[in-house]
Amino acid sequence: MVAELTALRDQIDEVDKALLNLLAKRLELVAEVGEVKSRFGLPIYVPEREASMLASRRAEAEALGVPPDLIEDVLRRVMRESYSSENDKGFKTLCPALRPVVIVGGGGQMGRLFEKMLTLSGYQVRILEQHDWDRAADIVADAGMVIVSVPIHVTEQVIGKLPPLPKDCILVDLASVKNGPLQAMLVAHDGPVLGLHPMFGPDSGSLAKQVVVWCDGRKPEAYQWFLEQIQVWGARLHRISAVEHDQNMAFIQALRHFATFAYGLHLAEENVQLEQLLALSSPIYRLELAMVGRLFAQDPQLYADIIMSSERNLALIKRYYKRFGEAIELLEQGDKQAFIDSFRKVEHWFGDYAQRFQSESRVLLRQANDNRH
């Protein structure tokens, strides 16, 4: 029996080696694709191509008796690696005549990411940090674009301190709140103004499939090329007004981050044994705990800035607190029917999204379980 099992395992090892060789060949082809895309200014991520390819592979897998979900899982992981490696080939310069780009706060993580992407795209990039401020006027004197990438709590102050910029210079900010910084830029500069909010962390590795929100400030025709450049990097653009942006971010960022903070604080105050929680946890709780722990591995100043960026955020969090209390009252009253009625009400509000999110989360939970040791 042992000899038979060993022989089968040896065959599996040989198949795995063949898979490795095929993956290496695929990455070589991806590198060639990256060179072609760079030369012609084509975006890294093309949704239609990816969807078509996955649909074809799923059908072919089913015909071979291979679970379609398996090949999709494998290919999605391979494609993520492919998108990352395509970065190394650089990108076409969509605005060759652009004068130097100055990134204010370019030493920070997001600033460094934009410096990398702009440099890979053939633009000259300068960094303006706090210790360079006495030379700021010289550094921005011939700038074609100035990107402000500083902590939220000093963004408007830094914008207000900028020396006069060339009239055709594009002024951009990357803050997580948009209305205040956008208004500050419109006051500080008479030329083109653009508000950006990258909806991802600087450790993403690739901009493929990442969302970049943009808010028009002034003269969109002057910065249209930059939006197209960001699309070439693989990102998806979403336009919204600065006011609507901040209203949505109250839910997406402020409330979510605060709830995560409060849960982490509760765990710490209860002094639970994390090792035991992890050993006993289901995949969904492990994933939730990972998201909580991830928050506390990052800069507390950033999250304080996001959560406390407006009175609107505080009002929303207070409403959440009130509803939390109302839900606790159901428990205190032991009113299961009222709980079920509330549950059904929310279920109805989610509509088809409930089933969609269940399917999406099922994939995430399988991946989380795969990573368990």
Where are the predicted features?
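Adenosine-cofactor binding site in Rossmann-like domains, unifying the SAM/SAH pocket
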Residues: 125-138
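Hydrophobic Val/Ile/Leu positions in short beta-strands of Rossmann-like dinucleotide-binding domains
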Residues: 103-104, 148, 214
